[in-house]
Amino acid sequence: MIRIISRANSVTSSNEVNRLVTGQIPHD
């Protein structure tokens, strides 16, 4: 469970960084 949450957090962080850099809002 913890591994999945950590991995999900990593993906979310990457998406947020990409959104800030590209200025685009990724649709979930």
UniProtKB/Swiss-Prot annotation:
It comes from the Bacteria. Keywords: Leader peptide. Induction: By iron depletion. Repressed by the ncRNA ryhB. One of its GO terms (biological process) is regulation of translation. Cotranscribed with fur, it is essential for fur translation. The fur ribosomal binding site (RBS) is occluded by the 5'-mRNA secondary structure, which is opened by uof translation. This is fur leader peptide. It comes from Escherichia coli (strain K12). The lineage of its organism: Bacteria, Pseudomonadati, Pseudomonadota, Gammaproteobacteria, Enterobacterales.
